[in-house]
Amino acid sequence: MLRLRPYRRSDAVNVISWIKTERIFRFWCADRFENYPITPDDLNDQYDNSEGAEDVFHFTAYDEQGIAGHINIRFPDKNDIDTVRFGYVILDDSRRGQGLGKAMVRLALKYSTEIMGAEKVTIGVFAENEPALRCYLAAGFRDTGVVEEYSINGEVWNCLELEYTCQDA
């Protein structure tokens, strides 16, 4: 059974190991890191020192086979505790296709709504990242129709804004 626990600095080794290409890296973090590849120390430094770091909750998904995934939950607006945003969502690439991504996102939704009291959860996903988009929609998110363009390595990628509300449950 998949579970969530607080992220540990040592988890960065696993998270970074799942990022095999720059394309996957950019799907995962967009432009949050300037250079690829990054090290576990780079990830932990970002988590410790980025603006608003105290308002971000990092989680590791695990099961009987070990660490399976990673997800962050943050308050995008300090004045709105009813809305949280997911980010840095990634699954162990060797364990994809088993429903673990959807299970992890659903656990994070449950935590967000039942523990944090959020009424709305948002996430951005690149349209080009079709497996992630399918996962989020299957977990209960819906497309808001809002699209933001990113320039990634000379290509224009469309970031779709998705949301989940308690009414969607």
Task: Label the predicted regions.
Residues P6-A12, S17-R96, V105-L107, Y111, ...:
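Acetyl-CoA-dependent GNAT
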